Each structure stands twice: as C-alpha cells, then as structure tokens.
Design a protein with these regions (language model features):
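N-terminal signal peptide c-region/cleavage motif recognized by signal peptidases
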Residues: 26-28
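Bacterial N-terminal signal peptides that target proteins for export
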Residues: 4-18
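Membrane-embedded beta-strand positions in outer-membrane beta-barrel channels/transporters
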Residues: 132, 136-138, 182-184, 225, ...
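Outer-membrane beta-barrel "beta-signal"
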Residues: 323-336
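Outer-membrane pore/translocation modules
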Residues: 109-129, 144-269, 279, 307-312, ...
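Outer-membrane beta-barrel initiation region
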Residues: 46, 50, 54-183
Length: 336
C-alpha cells in the first residue's frame, strides 16, 4: 500500500517535463528574444535534463545545476563582447574596432623629409615640423552574424584611418603629411579552448593598406592574415601573422623588411589605468616598431591618453624610416 502511495506522490517523467517547461516559460529569460549566450546556456541545460528524463532529480536541483552551467558560460565572454552583441543590430551605433584617439600634441625626434627631397617638391621639406597632430578612427560593421559555421562566428568589414597632420607648419599651408587607409574583411569565431577564465578567439581576413597618394609618394600593400587571441575583462593578447600579397607600387617592395610578418597586440587594465602595446618585427632584418600607450579617466566618455612610438613603420610614408614620437591627447575607445 505504501509503495502504491509513493508512486502516486512521485511525479511522472511527463509531469516533471511539464513543470520544467512551465518554469522556463515563466522565467524572465523567455520574455526577451535578445538573450545572451549565458541565458541560452541555461535554457539548453534545462531542456537537456528533460530529454534525459532523470527521475531522481528535483526541479530545484536541475535549476541549480543549470545555473552553474550558465555562470560558467558567462565567464567565457567579456564585457566588451557582451556590449557589442547588444548593439550589433542597432543601425545608429558604430562599433569601434581598433583604438580611436586624437593626439593634438606630438613631438618627433626628427621628421622624415626624405620622400620630399626631389625637385618636384622644391624646398617644401624644409617647412616640415617635428610637431604634428596624430589621430586614428577605426570601426567595424557586421556583415553576417547568423551561424556561418557555428553559433559564435561572424563576418565583418573593418576600416581604420590613421592620419598625420602638420597643423603647426603654417609656412607650407599645414598639409596632411600622410594618411593611411586600412579596409579589410575578416571572419571571427570563438575557439573551444578551456584554458583560462576568458575567451579564446581567432580571426582570418584580407586587408589592403594604402596612403592614397600617387607617383613618388604612393605606398600600398595587400595581405592575408590568420590570428589567434585571448581576452578577459582586464587583459588581452592577440598575435596576427600575415602573408604579404604585394602592392601596386614598385617603390615599397621591401616593406616586409621593416614591418615583418606579424603584429602583436596586448592590453592590460590596472585599476583605472589601461596599458596597451602594438608591435611588429622582422627576425631576419632586425627591424620593427613598437607603439606603447597608457590611458586614464578624464571625462565621462573620454579618457586621457599618452602614446609613445619607437621604430619603423609608424606610417606608410615612414615604413623604412626610424622614428621616435611622444604624444598626448584623448582616447574615445580603448582595446578592452
């Protein structure tokens, strides 16, 4: 008799499935179609437990177990990645790619006058100043975000503009000494690597870089790349080897000698400071360049920024010229 009563009191697998589905439907997660990856992890876990039909697990135990999986799934992302996901479908939001900054005051050890020494430019090179304005604008646009090969991959168009403005050289009409344009298309996906608490990712893409000039001042090249990186909320490292496809100009065929075959990007947050570094190097020639920076709070949406560069390849016009520069200004978006 007791056995019969226990069987009556114990919910059947079908009853448990109904209870779990009702509980899931009543949760705030189901009320929003724009769920995060961690919320989807929770939903999938509950449905998986229903499919397994484990009669000994109570509703509370299953939800507790799935909450742990949800927390673990949340750890494999970053604040920046979550914010980008939230605004990906907003047509009024431009997603930053690389750093966006303005350095109104920069000083070089010695400005590169070599490209302007021909008779075409006369004595214009004499008017170039060691002080100039440097700024960078960089953004990316998602082209495909829906399950290309897996649930976490995306295809982007990226564009970066970096400019060097001789604003203080009034004697030669304050020209833009060089402006570099970097359009690219790249595929990005998360990697199933469990090492660390952050997110492993990979990028594969094609990039064209040019200064938009003609004749003697023209510089450009094309490359394909495949990089791998690791990111947490306070740390990021990304290495991007590339293969040079060549350029349309015959005057920078040796660009690899100075820019190398890869780029390494790192960032680290310490309290309110963020330290960044971007470098490239050619192990055969011994040439390379390093850009190091530190940002700090200044205004609500603007950070102060100090940047230092040493080496070759700060710009395309200077790819084979060794330069040192220090600059101060503002930073709109950082790396992490």
């Amino acid at each position: 008799m007791n056995t019969y009563i226990n069987r009556i009191n114990q919910p059947s697998p079908q009853s448990k499935a109904l209870l779990l589905l009702l509980s899931l439907a009543a949760s705030p997660v189901m009320a929003d179609d724009t769920r995060t990856d961690s919320e989807q992890t929770f939903d999938n876990c509950v449905l998986r437990q229903i499919h397994m039909d484990v009669e000994q697990d109570s509703l509370e135990k299953i939800k507790a177990q799935c909450e742990q999986e949800k927390t673990a799934g949340r750890a494999k992302t970053t604040t920046r990645h979550e914010l980008e996901k939230e605004t990906a479908e907003n047509p009024f939001v431009i997603t930053p790619y690389r750093q966006n900054y303005l350095l109104p005051i920069t000083h070089m050890k010695s400005v590169n006058k070599n490209p302007y020494n021909s008779e075409v430019f006369g004595d214009a090179a004499d008017g170039l100043s060691d002080e100039e304005i440097k700024f960078q604008i960089s953004f990316k646009v998602p082209l495909i975000t829906d399950d290309i090969f897996n649930e976490s991959d995306e295809l982007y168009f990226g564009f970066t503009l970096k400019s060097f403005w001789q604003a203080y050289s009034s004697d030669i009409s304050a020209p833009f000494r060089d402006t570099n344009y970097r359009p690219e298309v790249f595929y990005e996906t998360k990697l199933p690597i469990e090492a660390g608490d952050g997110l492993w990712f990979s990028r594969v893409g094609y990039e064209h870089e040019s200064n938009g000039r003609t004749d003697e001042l023209s510089r450009s090249w094309n490359r394909i790349y495949a990089g791998v990186g690791y990111e947490e909320d306070n740390f990021m490292m990304y290495v991007e080897p590339w293969y040079n496809l060549g350029g349309m100009d015959s005057d920078n065929t040796d660009i690899e000698d100075y820019l190398g075959h890869y780029e390494l990007t790192t960032a680290y947050k310490y309290d309110v400071l963020e330290f960044t570094g971007v470098g490239h190097y050619n192990f055969r020639t011994g040439y390379g360049g390093l850009e190091a920076g530190v940002s700090f709070p200044l205004l609500e949406h603007v950070r102060g920024y100090v940047q230092y560069f040493n080496g070759y390849g700060e710009s395309l016009i200077d790819f084979d010229y060794h330069n040192q520069r220090i600059g101060v200004g503002i930073l709109l978006t950082d790396i992490i």
